Amino acid sequence: STLLASSAASDVYKRQALSVSVVGDFNDWNNDANFMYKISDGGVWELFIEGIPEFACYKYCVETPWHERRLKTDPYAFHCQTRPDNASRVYEIDGYEWHDEKWYDYKKEHPHKSMPVNVYEVNAGSWRKYEDGNVFSYRKLADELIPYVKNMGYTHIEFMPLTEYPFDGSWGYQVTGYFAATSRYGEPKDLMYFVDRCHEEGIGVILDWVPAHFPKDAHGLGRFDGTGCYEYEDPRIGEHKEWGTYIFNYGRYEVTSFLLSSAMFWLDKYHVDGIRVDAVASMLYLDYNRNDGEWIANAYGGRENLVAVDFLQKLNTVVHMFHPEAMMIAEESTAWPNVTRYPIKDMGLGFDYKWNMGWMNDMLSYISLDPLWRNYHHDTLTFSMVYAFSENFMLPISHDEVVYGKGSLINKMPGDYDMKFSGVRGFIAYMMAHPGKKLMFMGSEIGQFDEWNANEELEWNLLSFEKHRQLNLFFAEVNKFYRDVPAMHENDYDWDGFQWIALDDYKNSIISFRRIAYDGSEIICVCNFQPVQHDNYVVGVPEYGIYEEVFNSEAEEFGGCGIRNEGELKAKKKKDHELNYSMEITVPPLAVMYFKLKKKPVSYTHLDAAD
């Protein structure tokens, strides 16, 4: 076999690196045995070495202008040693035989914006473990995680970063290998196998990707030749002091080419279906987490990072050019406009989706309130619809919300044991009916009371308790209802898909609204955020006919109180909230219910007689 060791760098390399050699198993780590040749004024070094076996370890030995020699991991390595070791490994990335042609055909025929997107966010090392504490491999995850996700009705798996990283405590968000799948769980083709298996089961795969910053580990990208190569030299624009990381120099062509190549690599070689770009806000603002005097304004005196904006626009343009069916998702927490505008214009960034952090913060605050006080905060419940269609939003309840003392989802709920379960069911049923794609971090679906611990597996033993099994069943059923009913997902991004029925019943903390499919079929959603039952509650309906309850978060099989609206619900010619007809229903405590039109009357006269 042949090792082609090449490093494409900027002019800094040409000016600063005095020499580069390849060292490894094959030459007993001799710094002077295999020097690379500079083959262009652009700072490209190249070397061919014959007879290097696959999985052999190697590094670059880079000589700085001060004649210091530093061992560096190959920035373009496809495979690396498992931490704490950090050498690159020779690996043949091509040759995996894919079986996902039908999946790609399906994606081309079914644009994701009008399809159900319900993401199960996973940390690969702590979803489930062996009894001895060892983590599952990519292939073991394929055997265990994929059937679970399919049975639960989720449409996609999103992994926290699988790009190689040295520090477990970063959860993968401090990356040293932008082309290397972490070896914690196996080799690259094992991850390809996982993605392939997902596609065969109709499940998409999204990867977290971190182009915002990188760690200062000595073997990584930082100070690659002793100076700032991938990062800015000036710490006012080149470092995140709070995170202890470097910031990529987006104004340097070679750096943006490196990052663009990384994103395309995961789409091309690993067939992933989407990329969630982490920490976008930190890229957009030069004063992000900085005090006065700690940052440098742009050429116009502003705080916008114009070269980072240009990079993100290029990223989304290139991805959509070659992978129009791919999902590009921004974790962006500010009010930066047009994050999901595409084609790009007017400072639009070109993402497909943006995490709705405003909705997430408002709703987690609201559901944490004692119900006694919720009527004083009704605007928190309804405010999201003021801006719901300003971007293509995804509603996230992510890993960030169940760590660092924030409490698990079920422990955010006030009240006693039963009330906490009712609170989770009601909140999730409301979330599934709210416009926007969905994301839920692992563990909430089993009612885990403890916060997520990256060092431990989820508390699967909870499923030996009836309440937790019933909650797990609820998640599966509400996920499948969302997936199978077009009104719940087809039209998430304009008012044609959502209409308020009543948003003003603040005294009872009840809201009701319609979700409408392209063909006009619809679901009526009624949400009660008080532990109070209401009989003969009037809800406006759009048509004169017979309605039925098709989902109830308080159903007995889900562990609820079992109060339901059984049988036929006949609409009356009684106007309610701008709708010409209405029906009377029973509203259970803390319940969310879905209704649909079962049939229109044979004759209006016949129904009038029944009234």
Where are these regions (language model features)?
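Conserved alpha/beta catalytic core and glycan-binding cleft of carbohydrate-active enzymes
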Residues: H271-D273, Y288-E457, L462, R483-E554
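Substrate-binding/active-site clefts of carbohydrate-active enzymes
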Residues: Q81, E101-S114, N123-E304
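C-terminal accessory region downstream of the catalytic core in glycan-modifying enzymes
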Residues: L463, Q470-N472, V478-K480, V538-K570
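Single conserved hydrophobic/aromatic residue that forms the stacking wall/gate
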Residues: T2-A9, Y13, Y604-A609
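Core domains of carbohydrate- and sulfate-ester-processing enzymes
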Residues: V62-H110, E201, G220-Y232, W373-M385, ...
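C-terminal beta-strand-rich structural cap/linker in extracellular carbohydrate-active enzymes
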Residues: G567-P601
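Conserved, mostly hydrophobic/aromatic
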Residues: Y60, V122, F159, C198, ...
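Aromatic-rich carbohydrate-binding modules that target alpha-glucans
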Residues: D11-F55, E63-T82
